[in-house]
Curated annotation (Swiss-Prot):
Record field: catalytic activity: D-mannose(out) + n Na(+)(out) = D-mannose(in) + n Na(+)(in)
PROSITE patterns (UniProt xref): NA_SOLUT_SYMP_1, NA_SOLUT_SYMP_3
Phosphoserine modifications at: 604-605
Protein name in the entry: Sodium/glucose cotransporter 4
Originating gene: SLC5A9
A single Gene Ontology CC term: extracellular exosome
Native source organism of the sequence: Homo sapiens (Human)
């Protein structure tokens, strides 16, 4: 969606720019910042740290299941809140509001599309993942196809995407807001956020991440709704927004161009399939390809659903997340449009010199739409609340990325080199990798600082658009087509990556022209929208996967037990044999997964008493607790206990009452979603 920031946003060319001196309208956001605002921010940090400590103490942190999947004991409401906050980072507040300011409502369709895919996650994908007994998505592909090359490929690709797109986006956007609002040093503010974020991520694992995400979701939604009402009140509610947005033209413009004019279709989601900036077939079908990767196969999102205590709780989390994803259109996109309506000379600037003075970017200043609205409209105290909202968005998305990246590295990469690694070794490695990510994040700050904001968002969206469709095609075929084989899956991925990289190289070689410039890009770029390309790439990858699979030996039926949609309910006995043979990291490790609400301590306390541990210093005890290291040796489970544990962890049975409750809520959610699409179409 943020790709449209550059395409739709006000740009400027050096040719033909009027030379009269524009009024100095630099955004002095720090005016009026009060001690009460700082107090609110401090209180926010205290609450987050308190919740992080509470959940870290409560969590089972000494096992793979406890640290990476919260002991598979999470309820539906924190899962739903975490699904929301993991996706709505500070980058979404800045980028979504900025794109709304530049182009109107259409970008909100990206959020409403997520509702459908969240339900697909809970009803289609998660049942297969739980039945397969996996912790990571590459691990599922290894179980499904065998071999290691697909697992390693997916793990490395995901880590690269997390480090160089998601982390950079959130840090850039959060730092932009904090600098404008507080005037803090960039390194100091970002460093404090990263350290606080990393501490409770390392100490508490996924349970700490999910509970703090739930707190931050409440803060985000509450604060954003307050700003939304203040903004609508200022412009005269929705009719006033329609009138004032269409008149939001800056005083200094580029002659003989229309870049400074608001789009005539700004208040419509579904736009012309040929000339629209976000064509409706691409928004409905092409976006679904990208959203399937994001919501149904991406480790950051799926890991939250896998932590559910039952399939019904996973479904309930998807429903709650779907309801929450309806809101960003109203409390992010529309406030971005309100900001342009109120401040057309700043948010809607097109003169590159004026834009440079306002926000430091010559391509336009739509990125400042949300922070500008906060600093202009929010009263003392509430302004601090909104600063806390952006911090919450930044920290919640970073914790999600940190924990999921740690999971991928530990399970899919480290164990390739250390096959005999112990449970405690994996716990330490997972925590050390989070520290590594924090260091990389801090080193990435100067690169973000020197990057043009529009180009950065353009780059991130391009990377996602050209790498995600092959992954979507692979997972869909892996789950629904039993005939797909490992060679077909691998060579399909390689083909899709090659085609995607080719398009990406062309995109960067021929950047979109600024306002007033002649478009010299080849037709395949300027006339073939990236959402259309996503549909084509997904289809071509699927064709290659199927053709190569049909030319190779099919996978025996018995090896697909509980690994596809059609075999997810097969008896557990076959799964246990296969699990013991192919995934020793889960089934052969006694404390590898702990029952819902339980942990290593409970397992070790069963049976005979443990010998008294030798006394240790407070420093060593604190370090052992921080790293999740048990002071007493784990007691091995008997074969019968292992089988019972495996059955519980891979069960997709549901109580009829709660299954019906989830189904009814899903239908209601879809009805609301369809109504909104129709109303704003």
């Amino acid at each position: 969606m943020s790709k449209e920031l550059a395409a739709m946003g006000p740009g400027a060319s050096g040719d033909g720019v009027r030379t009269e001196t524009a009024p100095h309208i630099a955004l002095d956001s720090r005016v009026g910042l009060h001690a009460y605002d700082i107090s609110v921010v401090v209180i926010y940090f205290v609450f987050v740290i308190a919740v992080g400590i509470w959940s870290s103490i409560r969590a089972s942190r000494g096992t793979i299941g406890g640290y990476f999947l919260a002991g598979r004991s999470m309820s539906w409401w924190p899962i739903g809140a975490s699904l929301m906050s993991s996706n709505v980072g500070s980058g979404l507040f800045i980028g979504l509001a900025g794109t709304g300011a530049a182009g109107g409502l259409a970008v909100g369709g990206f959020e409403w599309n997520a509702t459908w895919l969240l339900l697909a996650l809970g009803w289609v994908f998660v049942p297969v993942y739980i039945a397969a007994g996996v912790v990571t998505m590459p691990q599922y592909l290894k179980k499904r196809f065998g071999g290691q090359r697909i697992q390693v490929y997916m793990s490395v690709l995901s880590l690269i995407l997390y480090i160089f797109t998601k982390i950079s986006t959130d840090i850039f956007s959060g730092a932009l807001f904090i600098q404008m609002a507080l005037g803090w040093n960039l390194y100091l503010s970002t460093g404090i956020l990263l350290v606080v974020t990393a501490v409770y991520t390392i100490a508490g694992g996924l349970m700490a991440v999910i509970y703090t995400d739930a707190l931050q979701t409440v803060i985000m939604v509450g604060g954003a709704l307050v700003l939304m009402f203040l903004g609508f009140q200022d412009v005269g509610w929705y009719p006033g927004l329609e009138q004032r947005y269409r008149q939001a033209i800056p005083n200094v413009t580029v002659p003989n161009t229309t870049c400074h004019l608001p789009r005539p279709d700004a208040f419509h989601i579904l736009r012309d399939p040929v000339s629209g900036d976000i064509p409706w077939p691409g928004l409905i079908f092409g976006l679904t390809v990208l959203a399937t990767w994001c919501w149904c196969t991406d480790q950051v999102i799926v890991q939250r659903s896998l932590s559910a205590k039952s399939l019904s709780h996973a479904k309930g989390g998807s429903v709650l997340g779907g309801y929450l994803k309806i809101l960003p259109m109203f409390f992010i996109v529309m406030p971005g449009m309100i900001s342009r309506a109120l401040f057309p000379d700043e948010v809607g600037c097109v003169d590159p010199d004026v834009c440079q003075r306002i926000c430091g970017a010559r391509v336009g200043c739509s990125n400042i739409a949300y922070p500008k609205l906060v600093m202009a409209l929010m009263p003392v105290g509430l302004r601090g609340l909104m600063i806390a909202v952006i911090m919450a968005a930044l920290m919640s998305s970073l914790t999600s990325i940190f924990n999921s990246s740690s999971t991928l590295f530990t399970i899919d990469v480290w164990q390739r080199f250390r096959r005999k690694s112990t449970e405690q070794e994996l716990m330490v490695v997972g925590r050390v990798f989070v520290v590594f990510l924090v260091v990389i994040s801090i080193l990435w700050i100067p690169i973000i600082q020197s990057s043009n904001s529009g180009q950065l968002f353009d780059y991130i969206q391009a990377v996602t658009s050209y790498l995600a469709p092959p992954i979507t095609a692979l997972f869909l075929l892996a789950i629904f087509c039993k005939r797909v084989t490992e060679p077909g899956a691998f060579w399909g991925l390689v083909f899709g990556l090659g085609v995607g990289l080719l398009r990406m190289i062309l995109e960067f070689s021929y950047p979109a022209p600024a306002c007033g410039e002649v478009d010299r890009r080849p037709a395949v770029l300027k006339d073939f929208h990236y959402l259309y390309f996503a549909i084509l790439l997904c289809g071509l990858t699927a064709i290659v996967i199927v053709i190569v699979s049909l030319c190779t030996t099919p996978i025996p039926e018995e090896q697909l037990t509980r690994l596809t949609w059609w075999t997810r309910n097969c008896p557990l006995s076959e799964l246990e044999k296969e699990a013991h043979e192919s995934t020793p990291e889960i089934s052969e490790r006694p404390a590898g997964e702990c029952p819902a609400g339980g942990g290593a301590a409970e397992n070790s306390s069963l049976g005979q008493e443990q010998p008294e541990a030798p006394s240790r210093s407070w420093g060593k005890l604190l370090w052992s607790w921080f790293c999740g290291l048990s002071g007493t040796p784990e007691q091995a489970l008997s074969p019968a206990e292992k089988a019972a544990l495996e059955q519980k962890l891979t069960s997709i049975e549901e109580e009829p009452l709660w299954r019906h409750v989830c189904n009814i809520n899903a239908v209601l959610l879809l009805a609301i979603n369809i109504f909104l699409w129709g109303y704003f179409a």
